[in-house]
């Protein structure tokens, strides 16, 4: 089954804790601090693997947690850093942050790497805090927590060729006879509801990937039917093969179908009309097909080639496949960052944003003061509260940031409860 969107959770490794230790050896008086630093945690890294074609593996594993760094040790030995957690994804994967909607990475080239969740650095051991005024400090840092994210992976099919057309014009049948793909084929509309991929051999040593995409209907560019799902898949297709039922067996007019499909492509994304398009007149083994083809040719430009075929009887296929292979050789790829030139909801618009304040103060109905903010929360989680010296250092950091004064201005008095993350303490004026 083809899966083109999936939501997963990623958690980078925490940094290892720093250690409080002292050098105690015979004949070495006043050995001094010897606590090592914690090791760096592991990043969560996505790497493009050209051998993967779908996101189906993520249906069975949706939680990815990287390893933590080792804690610091005595004798000034640092903890070992953890190895990055490498997650392989197919070409064309877009990674979005679910909470912010930001595009984190657009992975299109084999071997391309992107850090999706950054690891925390290791906490410093007490050797790092030695000063002339305090040569034997009894404080250390905890490791920094690793970043965690809920992300959505979106795969835009990286097929060389995309088959487009109204439902039941023979796209799935065509793919099944020119490749080893076995799409579902039936005599009703929307038999194909997800893309089917097939490797096609042109017969002269050249090959390409062809995608049988779900059928379009009028209004698809506004999301009617399978509209946006279909059009999302065709954005990176290099060559569009427009399949038309030339027999008109369903009471449709071939030229009107041709114009309607092109209109939907243009309405969705004007750049799609720049794709080379090959017109395929299918079902030429049916009555009235030849007459309809002649009429169709009179309504389009003379320099637009039309390839009459019958996917059922397999006539005209070799000429079509060679023409597609020739067209691919002269057609570049269309990366997403070139396609989305116009600003839309997926565009990353870079603008100046003021730095986030070090902390914010709010108050709950019961009178509790709540501290929040990335910087103050980071300082808190990296403080070793088992050591009095570390607690004193944290208090000095809060004072230097202006937290005490800000609480007083908000009306805090002796004994009031102040909450930071899941911990509470009393305010002392």
Swiss-Prot record:
Residue intervals of the OCT domain: 351-429
CC annotations in GO: cytoplasm
UniProt key word Oxidoreductase: no
Protein location: Cytoplasm
Keywords: Cytoplasm, GTP-binding, Hydrolase, Magnesium, Metal-binding, Nucleotide-binding
Positions of the Obg domain: 1-158
EC number(s) reported in the record: 3.6.5.-
GO molecular function, one term: magnesium ion binding
Pfam family of the protein (one): DUF1967
Binding site for GTP: 165-172, 190-194, 212-215, 282-285, 310-312
All copies of domain OBG-type G, residue ranges: 159-329
Chief site of localization: cytoplasm
Region entry Disordered, spans: 124-145
Cofactor (UniProt): Mg(2+)
PROSITE patterns noted in UniProt: G_OBG, GTP1_OBG, OBG, OCT
Any one GO biological process: ribosome biogenesis
Binding site for Mg(2+): 172, 192
Subunit structure, interactors included: Monomer.
Role, per record: An essential GTPase which binds GTP, GDP and possibly (p)ppGpp with moderate affinity, with high nucleotide exchange rates and a fairly low GTP hydrolysis rate. Plays a role in control of the cell cycle, stress response, ribosome biogenesis and in those bacteria that undergo differentiation, in morphogenesis control.
Similarity comment: Belongs to the TRAFAC class OBG-HflX-like GTPase superfamily. OBG GTPase family.
PANTHER family from the UniProt entry: DEVELOPMENTALLY REGULATED GTP-BINDING PROTEIN-RELATED, MITOCHONDRIAL RIBOSOME-ASSOCIATED GTPASE 2
Name listed for the protein in its UniProt record: GTPase Obg
Organism annotation: Listeria monocytogenes serotype 4a (strain HCC23)
Organism ancestry: Bacteria, Bacillati, Bacillota, Bacilli, Bacillales
Gene behind the chain: obg
